[in-house]
């Protein structure tokens, strides 16, 4: 998006050649989404999430980029790119809240709140096995529902939680990060 006001909720945006989501200025809310960059055909694939307050030489104030209760992951050790102009007076406002991120851990940023960072040394995280039901790079088959080991389970904040997941299933009292709520039996709407 360029200088737009957008809201992305309960969405899965995955495996694109370019950035899965790219925000150039404006206002954006990414709420309870799964952004996963496992695009297999080009090592120069984009980021899972790119946000900036400029494009080329043109300043585009980033009024807000809120990533809430979301998963942002992929093959690379860092699938999130925040690019800002050198001029500190230019607006560049972002927040990551109760999200699962594949990026180097940040400890001194007040805009990163209650976030879980994936271990970039863990090969199961790189392949998606840590989080998802199926990431089969050989056959190009993917299922981005959460598996039982995912650190995304029960880590969303109620404050920004949506009542239903992308499949239309009711989220429980301890909602999960990402667009899919984990259920032990995927055909059942109740956790066992």
Language-model regions, residue ranges each:
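Predominantly extracellular beta-rich ligand-binding scaffolds that present long acidic/polar faces
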Residues: 9-143
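Extracellular beta-sheet-rich ligand-binding/adhesion modules
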Residues: 1-15, 186-192
């Amino acid at each position: 998006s360029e200088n737009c006001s957008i809201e992305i909720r309960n969405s899965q945006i995955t495996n694109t050649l370019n950035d899965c989501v790219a925000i150039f200025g404006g206002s954006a809310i990414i709420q309870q989404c799964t952004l996963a960059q496992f695009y297999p055909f080009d090592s120069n694939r984009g980021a899972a999430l790119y946000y900036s307050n400029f494009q080329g030489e043109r300043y585009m104030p980033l009024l807000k980029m809120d990533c809430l209760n979301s998963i942002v992951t992929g093959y690379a050790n860092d699938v999130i790119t925040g690019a800002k102009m050198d001029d500190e007076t230019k607006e560049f406002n972002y927040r990551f809240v109760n999200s699962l991120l594949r990026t180097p851990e940040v400890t001194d940023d007040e805009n990163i709140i209650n976030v879980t960072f994936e271990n970039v040394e863990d090969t199961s995280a790189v392949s998606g096995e840590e989080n998802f039901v199926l990431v089969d790079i050989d056959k190009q088959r993917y299922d981005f529902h959460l598996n039982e080991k995912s650190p995304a389970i029960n880590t969303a904040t109620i404050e920004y939680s949506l009542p239903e997941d992308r499949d239309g299933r009711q989220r429980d009292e301890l909602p999960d990060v990402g667009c899919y709520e984990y259920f032990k039996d995927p055909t059942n709407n109740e956790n066992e």
